């Protein structure tokens, strides 16, 4: 059966839910699809379908990242539901990297919690441009003053992390009430908070300026072998565009020269696409490439547009203990993981002359040597991780090869 064609009629925006475990991110995601489905602007996706990470289903903790799609009158949205559990912050980094804007979900009775702070910090690090807040479970609070205090605390938290806390919209509501309602009337009072939220997302999160005219680049997130058709790589196009017949290179994660291949198809949401452009989440079918010849962490790029490098200088901020960072300094030769685009790569650190150690809270320029070359360029941002947590955030200042 021929696949449906994806029609591009509205601006496309990537959003996602972030926040502390059990504050209602997945319930809200399901509720959005339910309410918009009443307008014919989405397909309802249930809580269980979103929370479909079987090994963790028992504890009700979301681990995998789930993509849903929906529309408003103004835009077409791809929405990722991000894991809230600290162990899966790594997934959070891959998810948040895909956001033009975030919906921060905070349970009103609990207020901001450690993971709320960590997610806001990460959103800042991976440069999520804008955020709206959904203050959930307000039906469990009958004290208006307490609600206002929680809002105040949230605005302060956002401001402290470089977001405009005073102007960010905070929508109050109950995701569960909207999700469990049996009403088919879009004007039912329990649905109003969802409509208000989508309105805030439409109005407050800017339509991103896509880097369509730059050379094509897509970080590879996943690789699939399709019998009889070849190998498909998936990811979000960072810049440029790609269509069937284009020659591309697979760059990085190897000491060998980049491999050239030809694109034999592009798909989005299981529909064929004439051309994938910056900002799209796509699958790209590659000619003559074995499933084993390509891996997560590599990039697909216009030939010659980006090269793999192992050594670079970087400006790095080392998180304080209070921000979830290290409690102790580190020294030259420290070998953490560098989280670059879609993968962790081990690297060794050299410090500038006269610097003997780096304290939590320091800003420092360092020289990094990765164990394997990766597609990098000046201005690229990355996280430094150790033992499953973020200990620093950096930006590449110069390539040294």
From Swiss-Prot:
Keyword Nucleotidyltransferase: no
Region (G2): 60-64
Region G1, residue ranges: 19-26
InterPro entries: EF-Tu_GTP-bd, EF-Tu_GTPase, EFTu-like_2, EFTU_2, G_TR_CS, P-loop_NTPase, Small_GTP-bd, T_Tr_GTP-bd_dom
Ligand binding (GTP): 19-26, 81-85, 136-139
Stored NCBIfam families: EF-Tu, PRK00049.1, PRK12735.1, PRK12736.1, small_GTP
PANTHER family: ELONGATION FACTOR TU, MITOCHONDRIAL, ELONGATION FACTOR TU-RELATED
Record's protein name: Elongation factor Tu 1
Organism, scientific name: Roseiflexus castenholzii (strain DSM 13941 / HLO8)
Gene this protein is translated from: tuf1
């Amino acid at each position: 059966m021929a696949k449906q064609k994806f029609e591009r009629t509205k601006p496309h925006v990537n959003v996602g839910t972030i926040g502390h475990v059990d504050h209602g991110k997945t319930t809200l995601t399901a509720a959005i699809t339910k309410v918009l489905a009443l307008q014919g602007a989405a397909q309802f996706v249930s809580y269980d379908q979103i929370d479909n990470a079987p090994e963790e289903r028992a504890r009700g903790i979301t681990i995998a990242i789930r993509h849903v799609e929906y529309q408003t009158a103004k835009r077409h949205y791809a929405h990722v539901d991000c894991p809230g559990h600290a162990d899966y912050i790594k997934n959070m980094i891959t998810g948040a990297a895909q956001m033009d804007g975030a919906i921060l979900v905070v349970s009103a009775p609990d207020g901001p919690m450690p993971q709320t702070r960590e997610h806001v910090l990460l959103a800042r690090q991976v440069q999520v441009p804008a955020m709206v807040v959904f203050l959930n479970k307000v039906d469990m609070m009958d004290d208006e003053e307490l609600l206002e205090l929680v809002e105040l605390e949230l605005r302060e938290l956002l401001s402290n992390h470089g977001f405009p806390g005073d102007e960010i919209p905070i929508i109050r509501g109950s995701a569960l009430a909207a999700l469990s309602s049996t009403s088919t009337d879009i004007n039912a009072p329990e649905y109003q908070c969802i409509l208000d939220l989508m309105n805030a997302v439409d109005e407050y999160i800017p339509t991103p300026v896509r880097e369509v005219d730059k050379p094509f680049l897509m970080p590879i997130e996943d690789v699939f072998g399709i019998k009889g058709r070849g190998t498909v790589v998936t990811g979000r196009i960072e810049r440029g565009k790609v269509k069937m017949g284009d020659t591309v290179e697979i760059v990085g994660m190897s000491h060998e020269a980049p491999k050239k291949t030809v694109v034999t198809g592009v798909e989005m949401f299981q529909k064929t696409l004439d051309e994938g452009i910056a900002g799209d989440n796509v699958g790209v079918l590659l000619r003559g490439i074995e499933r084993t010849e390509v891996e997560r962490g590599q990039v697909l790029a216009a030939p010659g547009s980006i090269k793999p490098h192992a050594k670079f200088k970087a400006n790095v901020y080392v998180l304080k203990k209070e921000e979830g960072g290290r409690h102790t300094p580190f020294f030259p030769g420290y070998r953490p993981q560098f989280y670059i685009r879609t993968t962790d790569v081990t690297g060794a650190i050299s410090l500038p002359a006269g610097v003997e150690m780096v304290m939590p809270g320091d800003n420092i320029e360092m020289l990094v040597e990765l164990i394997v070359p990766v597609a990098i360029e000046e201005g690229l941002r990355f996280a430094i991780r150790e033992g499953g947590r973020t200990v620093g955030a950096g930006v590449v200042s110069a390539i040294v090869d």
